[in-house]
């Protein structure tokens, strides 16, 4: 069955401005609740572009009691439509859409996922529907989130494409300083030589000495060190400590000498690529390029060629603050910027050659600005290999695959929240096996544990029993054995989580939902902007103990 124009929100027609480009994404939220609304609030305010809520429920008294984005006049109206209307008041520049068709019929339509860049599904949800969402996400390479928020506990899992590269990872500023002091190029060496002239024979004036950039000081004393050590630079911690002593002894009272002393350990490092970066260079996507390869992989291949040739990555070109005359500091900046431009130009030439070799259309030529950004952050690029999130089906064993041993080890760690993940899997399996009329359950056609007046004791036993079974299956799959008292302690921890989520009866506490929605929104923005490194791949929050943990499951 085809999706009509009325069913699918219209695409963006206008050319977006710079700010709009950053957040111009289509987001689909399957099912609405307090956590989902809190997430959307944090996405609408900065300007998500487009969002769609799919929810066939109508607003009830219970909804009014937990959601700040519904009002008395909303009672009896479609929850999705009312939520969209009120959310859009936060930012008129955002386009919101509501689909009130039942999820189980809407998802059977052709191209149901086509307009969207990201999907978020809220528990409880029918396992077969979640399975279809996961499958579509994997086929179309559309990132998908699946979250729980029950009482004081919450979690969310993220399904990313098989290869999800991030260039703009925003590393700590101290980690991005790359001055190449161990491998200076002629222009830098000459500048340092000029600025330190007269330093050894004492002919330099006191003001000039006090304003020598610390990078030049280190280059000067490195030359002295090499003369005394067969041309070798300090490489071990002991040698660097001795070198620091040499620098400080030259003039312990001047600020620039103190800056040079403090910079030794963090700047005198070989310009080698990290193992994570080398893994990206060796990835099949970088080795087997074709005309339709994403720009990231063409640039990665070109930078890999640069690294193989020069044994160093392209120079970022940034210079940290340091005590110096303004003219000298600007001159030093220009030297680094010039070298960075030269390195980038070489990478650009390699990219153009790769485009020719792969038969890439000139209309699809990689933007030079994108290449420049890659070169600046080449030392900190990151690749996430997406994993499908787990789905609990009635009567089917849950497997952990190649993560079984690691997760079995997590089970025995008292501080680990893997037990909470197991409890939510058990919660999902309970939901999958207990269908009821929509008016009686915590979700459409589904019954959540503890939702009935007299269900707490019975449902706690059932959910705990399912969780214990998952624990035993995990230990067996890992091919290991957990002895007492660790085994009993593990089951007790899992049992406590199960009791807590059943006690909540499927209800969401607004403070926990608000926090979880904020976490979700943060990760959504990371994914849609490809900035910072997203969660890989499951985040767990225990509101009772105020603890959070990220696990790759």
Identify the residue ranges that each predicted region occupies.
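Adenine nucleotide-associated cytosolic modules
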Residues: 1-553
């Amino acid at each position: 069955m085809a999706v009509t124009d009325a069913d699918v929100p219209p695409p963006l027609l206008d050319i977006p401005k710079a700010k709009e480009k950053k957040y111009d994404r289509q987001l689909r939220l399957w099912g609405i609740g307090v956590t989902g609304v809190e997430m959307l609030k944090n996405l609408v305010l900065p300007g998500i572009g487009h969002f769609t809520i799919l929810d066939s429920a109508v607003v009830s008294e219970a909804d009014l009691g937990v959601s700040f984005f519904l009002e008395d006049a909303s009672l009896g109206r479609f929850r999705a439509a009312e939520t969209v209307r009120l959310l859009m008041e936060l930012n008129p520049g955002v386009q919101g859409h509501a689909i009130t068709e039942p999820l189980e019929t809407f998802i059977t339509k052709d191209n149901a996922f086509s307009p969207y860049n990201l999907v978020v599904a809220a528990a409880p949800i029918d396992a077969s529907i979640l399975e279809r969402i996961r499958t579509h996400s994997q086929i179309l390479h559309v990132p998908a989130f699946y979250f729980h928020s029950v009482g004081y506990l919450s979690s969310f899992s993220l399904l990313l494409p098989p290869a999800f590269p991030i260039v703009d990872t925003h590393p700590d500023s101290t980690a991005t300083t790359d001055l190449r002091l161990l491998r200076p190029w002629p222009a830098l060496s000459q500048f340092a030589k000029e600025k330190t002239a007269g330093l050894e024979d004492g002919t330099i004036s006191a003001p000039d000495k006090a304003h020598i950039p610390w990078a030049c000081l280190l280059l000067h004393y490195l030359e002295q060190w090499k003369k005394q050590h067969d041309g070798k630079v300090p490489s071990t911690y002991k040698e660097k400590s001795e070198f620091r002593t040499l620098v400080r002894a030259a003039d312990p009272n001047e600020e620039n000498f103190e800056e040079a002393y403090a910079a030794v350990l963090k700047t005198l490092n070989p310009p080698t690529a990290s193992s994570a970066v080398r893994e990206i260079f060796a990835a099949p996507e970088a080795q087997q390029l074709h005309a339709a390869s994403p720009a990231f992989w063409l640039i990665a291949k070109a930078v890999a060629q640069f690294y193989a040739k020069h044994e160093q990555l392209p120079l970022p070109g940034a210079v940290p603050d340091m005590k110096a005359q303004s003219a000298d500091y600007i001159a030093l900046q220009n030297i680094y910027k010039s070298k960075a431009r030269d390195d980038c130009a070489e990478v650009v030439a390699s990219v153009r050659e790769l485009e020719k070799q792969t038969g890439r259309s000139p209309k699809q030529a990689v933007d030079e600005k994108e290449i420049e950004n890659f070169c600046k952050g080449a030392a900190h690029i990151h690749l996430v290999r997406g994993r499908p999130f787990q789905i609990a089906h009635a009567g089917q064993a849950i497997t952990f695959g190649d993560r079984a041993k690691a997760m079995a080890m997590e089970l025995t760690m008292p501080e680990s929240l893997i037990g909470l993940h197991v409890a939510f899997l058990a919660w999902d399996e309970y939901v999958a096996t207990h269908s009821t009329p929509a008016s009686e359950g915590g979700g459409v056609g589904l019954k959540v544990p503890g939702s009935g007046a007299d269900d707490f004791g019975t449902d706690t036993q059932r959910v705990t029993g399912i969780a214990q079974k998952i624990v035993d299956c995990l230990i067996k799959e890992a091919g290991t054995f957990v002895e007492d008292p660790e085994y009993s302690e593990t089951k007790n921890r899992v049992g406590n989580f199960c009791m807590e989520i059943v006690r909540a009866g499927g209800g969401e506490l607004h403070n926990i939902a608000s926090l979880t929605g904020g976490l979700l929104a943060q990760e959504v923005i990371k994914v849609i902007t490809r900035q910072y490194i997203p969660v890989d791949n499951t985040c767990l929050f225990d509101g009772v103990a105020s603890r959070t943990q990220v696990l790759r499951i």
